[in-house]
Swiss-Prot record:
Family note: Belongs to the CdhD family.
Source taxon at top rank: Archaea
Free-text function comment from the UniProt entry: Part of a complex that catalyzes the reversible cleavage of acetyl-CoA, allowing growth on acetate as sole source of carbon and energy. Probably maintains the overall quaternary structure of the ACDS complex.
NCBIfam families the record matches: cdhD, PRK04452.1-1, PRK04452.1-2
Protein name per its UniProtKB record: Acetyl-CoA decarbonylase/synthase complex subunit delta 2
One annotated GO biological process: one-carbon metabolic process
Alphabetic keyword roster: Methanogenesis
Assembly, per entry: Heterodimer of delta and gamma chains. The ACDS complex is made up of alpha, epsilon, beta, gamma and delta chains with a probable stoichiometry of (alpha(2)epsilon(2))(4)-beta(8)-(gamma(1)delta(1))(8) (Potential).
Alphabetical list of SUPFAM superfamilies matching this protein: Dihydropteroate synthetase-like (SSF51717)
Length: 436
């Protein structure tokens, strides 16, 4: 049995010696603490705590001995043994997974189908009816086919306006006649629909009376037999009156009234739509929560049926604007598929807004050190095509466009993805030398 000593014994041992300090001497030993008559067992956690406190106490004793001239070396505690890490089992087979877009459990809600235009069978005079919506998945998956293809409506204005040169050269001779303008869009540029914008009604432009503007709507209805959308000037005070009068003269044709928004009298527009058999374009500005709010008010406050609501979440031009527009539309469509019944409606895009970016129509960059932008005759239409195609992938159904080349290219791409146009198979494995 090892001999036990107290710290006082060590002090007494050197009391009669002329020793000021001990150098190169290590005193090894264990410190015991008598706990007396403690009962209740010795908990492992208590043991660990006492061990830590004992080590601290030993250090204090060593420092105290040094103060009296007897430095005491304290050996560092041994590092605890570390168990070797177990080797991860080798993976023999990958976990089986299958992507079945037609049967994704979270996508349990179908997008509402909304018709635009009444044929004679429906009580109108349109030659065809356009159907939007009905999707059960994101667009263009071959194993989850879209029930209705994308549609394009080409813009017409009730007065001559300033347009980019690349656009204007296609319409210059008809810009003073909305009826002829609409007819050219249908007969030459293959428009699925026509959007007539009554911008002259703006009090800051011509302040055309609503009654006179309604005559322009009648002119367009007589010039073409495709469904039409009717837009105001964007003036929140004037638009409800203008759209109500336009709805009256086009009664029974099931036009799309563009648009109801939170910053104007949406109830008046909804009332006109219900009274004269039209659809409502629910327009918000890149805000999904505002879109939900407006849709909810149209349904709950104004009693607009679900099959008469189309959303326009706003389209911004290429750059950050397109990023926001795409993300907003995709979030809306995913939320709708997952059951948000305030968002389960087809979407419309003002793709013409692409021409609002100066890069689409300017001759060249205003910065001398900038790179060459290329010919605007190509650049502008491509700007509009990319805007529309991006939003088509996000789930957009209806495109409001202007340049005939943009219309033709977007229709060809979306109809090919839809399955309407057969194309030659491309060897994607030989992508370097493939001709597309």
């Amino acid at each position: 049995m090892a001999k036990k000593m107290k710290l006082s014994d060590i002090t007494n041992m050197f009391a009669g010696m002329d020793v000021e300090a001990l150098e190169g001497v290590t005193i090894e030993g264990d410190i015991e603490i008598d706990l007396g008559g403690l009962g209740g067992g010795f908990d492992p956690m208590l043991a660990a705590a006492l061990g830590q406190e004992s080590a601290i106490l030993a250090q204090h004793f060593a420092r105290l001995a040094g103060m009296f001239g007897y430095p005491v070396g304290i050996g560092a505690p041994a590092a605890p043994a570390v168990s070797p890490a177990l080797a991860a089992p080798k993976l023999k087979d990958l976990i089986p997974a299958k992507f079945d877009v037609a049967n994704i459990a979270e996508w349990a809600t179908e997008i509402q189908e909304v018709p635009i235009g009444n044929t004679s069978a429906d009580g109108g005079s349109r030659g065809k009816r356009v159907m939007l919506g009905g999707e059960k998945a994101l667009p263009f998956y071959f194993d989850a086919p879209m029930p209705n293809r994308n549609q394009v409506t080409i813009d017409v204005f009730d007065m001559r306006i300033g347009l980019a040169k690349a656009v204007k050269e296609n319409y210059d001779e008809v810009m003073d006649s909305p009826g002829e303008w609409a007819k050219k869009n249908v007969e030459k540029f293959n428009a699925d629909m026509i959007t007539i914008h009554l911008i002259s009604t703006d009090p800051l432009i011509k302040d055309t009376p609503a009654k006179e503007a309604a005559k322009t709507v009648e002119e367009v209805l007589q010039a073409v037999d495709v469904p039409i959308a009717i837009g105001g000037s964007g003036n929140p005070q004037k638009d409800p009156e203008v759209l109500a009068r336009a709805a009256e003269v086009s009664e029974g044709e099931r036009c799309l009234l563009a648009s109801a928004s939170l910053n104007l009298d949406y109830a008046a527009i909804a009332e006109a739509a219900l009274k004269y058999d039209h659809d409502v374009l629910s327009w918000t500005q890149l805000d999904m929560n505002a879109q939900k709010e407006l849709n909810r008010k149209l349904m709950k406050q104004c009693n607009v049926p679900r099959d008469r609501i189309i959303m326009d979440p706003t389209t911004a031009a290429l750059g950050y604007g397109l990023d926001y527009a795409y993300t907003n539309m995709e979030r809306i469509r995913l939320a709708a598929l997952m059951g948000d019944d305030e968002l389960t409606f087809p979407m419309s895009s003002g793709t013409t807004n692409a021409w609002g970016a100066r890069e689409s129509w300017m001759v060249s960059s205003p910065l001398k050190e900038d790179s060459d932008w290329g010919p605007r005759e190509y650049r502008g239409p491509i700007w509009e095509i990319v805007t529309g195609l991006s939003l088509a992938i996000a789930g957009n159904d209806l495109f409001m466009m202007m340049h005939p080349t943009s219309v033709a290219v977007l229709k060809q791409i979306t109809q090919t993805l839809f399955g309407m146009i057969d194309t030659e198979q491309v060897d994607v494995a030989n992508w370097i030398g493939a001709e597309v």
